[in-house]
Amino acid sequence: MIEKTTDNIDIQETNLIALSPDLLNTLLKDHTTSQNGIQHNIFWATSDYEHLGIGYEYQSPILPELITGNNGNVVMPRVLKHKVTQTMRSHEMAEVFTPSWICNAQNNLIDEAWFGRKDVFNKEITVADGTNTWQVNEEKITFPEGKTWKDYVRENRMEITCGEAPYLVSRYDTTTGEFIPVERRIGLLDRKLRIISENATTSGEWLK
């Protein structure tokens, strides 16, 4: 079962900048407008933070100092925000999030088509209380004739929705905040990382 906790779902930007300032800068970079060696950051694109003062306006760029240190809790997952804020954003911005079990079911359809068989990474189940979940396939993933693990990793995948990208990575259920252990994750990227871990024989090969 999925672990019933929200304690560790928020990645603290203060910890991130301590680990690697370059990494945080890369995450904040607007890859569309940054050109000729000049970086432009993504902007807030919301008025929700304007009450915090200068730098938090709708079109202001998100700078590291605005979300770290004493401001380390400014950015947080939607599920950890106040319920009134969540409801308001749903009504005003059509902000809706998908349960992990639905993300898993739809990602499974993609893999069923690619592998030519069902239940490659996990099997969808419904428990006695009606909860939808999944049972992980703990065996090493095998590949159909004519396809290799590198083919799978190189396959292009795109999430057509926006927000917290639950179809790509699944650290937690975006609707409940429940943390999902690594071995149970169901995102498209999660699956590729599992395949790499099962097949790469050296750290250099893993990092390619």
Sequence positions of predicted segments:
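Class I S-adenosyl-L-methionine
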Residues: 2-208
